[in-house]
Amino acid sequence: MDATQGRRHTADAGGQGTADADAEQFWERHYGTRRAWDAHVNPLLAETAAPLCPGVALDLGCGPGGDTIWLAQQGWHVTAVDISTTAVERVRDRARDLGIAGRVVTEQHDLASSFPAGQFDLVSAQYFHTPFAFPRGRVLRTAAHALRPDGLLLIVDHGSTAPWSWNQDPDIHYPTPTEIAAELDLDPEHWSVLRAEMPGRQATGPAGETATVIDNVLLVQRRDRSMAA
Ligand SMILES: C[S@@+](CC[C@H](N)C(=O)[O-])C[C@H]1O[C@@H](n2cnc3c(N)ncnc32)[C@H](O)[C@@H]1O
C-alpha cells in the first residue's frame, strides 16, 4: 500500500489521491446529507484506551469522529482517516473548535489503495464496514504491522443487525472475532489476541427506539520488539 496517496487535511497540507469512485461517492453522500453530526466515543474503545498512557493513535474509518475527538481529549495524538472528505473535514473542524487541533491530523484515504504513514500505539477500527468490495483483512493486517511494540489494534464490528440499520439483508454474515483473527493471519509469535468476545449492549436508534445488539470485539497486541520499524 502506498502511504503517500492520501489527502491530508491540516491547515498547511494538501494533495491528491485516488479512490474507488463508487465507494467514495456513497460515503460522501452518506455524510454530506447528514444534518445531525452527533458523535460519541464507542464505550468499548473508551474501556480499552482509558487505562493506557496516551500515545499515538490511528482511527480507521473515523466517520463522524467521536472516537478521534475523545482520544485527543484524553491526550492522544490521533490520525483520523476516512474515504469521505466531508467526514475528515468535519472532524478537523470539530477538533479546531474544541481547541485540540494540535493533537488531530485528518487524512482522506481510500484504505484499499493507500494507508497513512507512521507507527502507532493504538489503532482503532470501529464498525469499519462498507457495502463495497474491500480488502478489509489486508487493511487490518497492515494496521497490525503499523503498531509499535506493545501497541494495540482494537476492532469492534457489528455482530447483529439493529432494527434501524440501513442494511437489513437477512443473509448478512457478521464475521466472528475468531474469523476476523483468522483473516488477519498474524503470526502468534509476534501478535497476541488479548480479547475475542461478542458482548451485547443496549442501543438507541435514530427515533429513540432501543434494542439489544451484539458487537464483535477483537483486541490484538504486537509483542515482537525486533520487528518494529
Ligand atoms: C459504518 S461507518 C463507521 C464510522 C465510525 N468509525 C463509527 O464508529 O461511527 C464506516 C466508515 O468507514 C469509512 N470507509 C468505508 N470505506 C472506506 C475505505 N475504502 N477507506 C477509508 N474509509 C472507508 C466510511 O466512510 C465510514 O465512515
Regions found by a protein language model. Give the residues of each.
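Conserved class I S-adenosyl-L-methionine
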Residues: 1-52, 55-63, 161
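Core SAM-dependent methyltransferase catalytic element
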Residues: 204-229
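A short, conserved alpha-helix within the catalytic core of class I
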Residues: 130-143
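Class I SAM-dependent methyltransferase SAM/SAH-binding core
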Residues: 68-111
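A short acidic, Gly/Pro-enriched loop at the edge of an enzyme's catalytic core
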Residues: 115-122
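Conserved beta-strand signature within the Rossmann-like core of class I S-adenosyl-L-methionine
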Residues: 150-158
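Short alpha-helix
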Residues: 173-189, 195-196
